[in-house]
Regions:
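Short, small-residue-enriched loops and turns at beta-alpha junctions
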Residues: 29-30, 57-61, 112, 133-134, ...
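Short glycine/serine/threonine-rich phosphate/pyrophosphate-binding segments
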Residues: 82-93, 112-114, 165-168
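Conserved N-terminal alpha-helix of the aminotransferase class I/II PLP-enzyme fold
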Residues: 38-85
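Active-site phosphate-binding strand-loop segment of PLP-dependent enzymes
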Residues: 126, 131-177
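Substrate-binding/gating loop at the entrance of the active-site cleft, primarily
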Residues: 85, 106-122
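N-terminal "arm"/small-domain region of PLP-dependent enzymes with the aminotransferase-like
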Residues: 1-49
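Conserved PLP-anchoring active-site segment centered on the Schiff-base-forming lysine
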Residues: 93-112
Length: 177
């Protein structure tokens, strides 16, 4: 019966053609891996479905701290932090690095989590048209003029590598230049 089995990284179309399925979070076909399923059941029995709270209150478990230590060691850094979901990560990283008085120039097509992070940061936000490098340059020039009258402040450009809302890819070399 169609639609009753887990989708994998590849799907067969009605015309017989096999294509990559980028509309699924099952990119690596973990859903069909019996070893991972068994391990997931063991973890659920030991820890339940989630910590249900912020890390410093009652949301941290030994497996979280072990994983953070392992990742930090792998990266060769003193420490790291992991989040339970991508939205939390995205929306909290921006305000962690920026603050009131900073200027952030952002692509108008960034996803909702990035928009929330920009809002939470309380920085001044200037928008440029989606993937429009000429408009980005125009906005940056205006920021430069505005900053001539104000004390030194930090500036950031915020974009996505692969835009969640449009599927477009950013021209990162153009932004960096």
């Amino acid at each position: 019966m169609p639609g009753t089995r887990p989708t994998g990284p590849k799907v067969k179309l009605s015309n017989g053609r096999t294509v990559n399925n980028f509309a699924s979070y099952n990119f690596f076909n973990f859903v069909s891996n019996e070893l991972l399923k068994d391990r997931a059941v063991q973890v659920l029995r030991n820890y339940g479905v989630g910590a249900c709270g912020p890390p410093n209150f009652y949301g941290t478990q030994d497996v979280h701290m072990d994983t953070e230590r392992d990742i930090a060691k792998f990266l060769g850094v003193p420490a790291c932090i992991i989040y339970a979901q991508a939205f939390s990560t995205i929306s909290s990283v921006i305000p962690a690095f920026s603050k009131r008085g900073d200027i952030i120039v952002a692509d108008k097509a960034v996803n909702f989590a990035i928009q929330k992070g920009l809002q939470i940061s309380r920085s001044t936000i200037r928008w440029y048209e989606h993937n429009d490098m000429e408009d980005l340059e125009r906005v940056l020039e205006q920021v430069k003029k505005d900053m001539a009258r104000k004390p030194l402040t930090r500036r950031f450009i915020v974009t996505e590598g692969l835009f969640e809302n449009t599927g477009d890819i950013v021209d990162l070399p153009a932004i960096v230049s």
